[in-house]
């Protein structure tokens, strides 16, 4: 929607494709890392649950800057997201990290979900708890990010 375009930052598959093309990354030529998923963090695995992305960002900031104040607000469901954006535009959330998930409960409860939101969230939480690392900045893959920066 053009009315929200300047207020909402998102990344779509088409845009990611453009980024990969610009960086000359051939995704189809990449080899699958069988340990890749097992090296994920609790935070990374919780991205699919409402509040999970913002919590991951918060945890990395707290690790690096423990005294920094972090204000966050999140919404789930389009109605609540719209309300959050309206309040943000009115200045109610200046300096806040905002997270909005279109689906109630987060992506884990998206259109293809075949079980209750609570059951889906519980399954994600159980899977996340088995991760080797708590915070995403503790995984081996963070070191690879420097290669993407000139």
Task: Indicate where each model-derived feature is located.
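Single conserved hydrophobic/aromatic residue that forms the stacking wall/gate
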Residues: 1-5, 9
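Long, compositionally biased charged/polar accessory segments in the mid-to-C-terminal portions
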Residues: 7, 13-150
């Amino acid at each position: 929607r053009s009315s929200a375009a300047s207020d909402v930052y998102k990344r779509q598959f088409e845009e990611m494709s453009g980024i990969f093309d610009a960086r000359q990354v051939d995704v189809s030529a990449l080899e699958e890392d069988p340990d890749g998923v097992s090296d994920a963090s609790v935070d990374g695995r919780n991205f699919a649950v409402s509040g999970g992305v913002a919590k991951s960002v918060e945890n990395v900031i707290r690790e690096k800057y423990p005294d920094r104040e972090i204000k966050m607000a999140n919404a789930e469901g389009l109605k609540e997201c719209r309300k959050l954006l309206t309040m943000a535009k009115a200045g109610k959330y200046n300096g806040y990290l905002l997270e909005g998930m279109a689906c109630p409960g987060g992506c884990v409860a998206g259109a293809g979900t075949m079980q209750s939101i609570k059951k889906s969230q519980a399954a994600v939480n159980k899977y996340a708890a088995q991760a080797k690392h708590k915070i995403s900045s503790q995984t081996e893959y963070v070191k690879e990010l420097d290669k993407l920066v000139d």
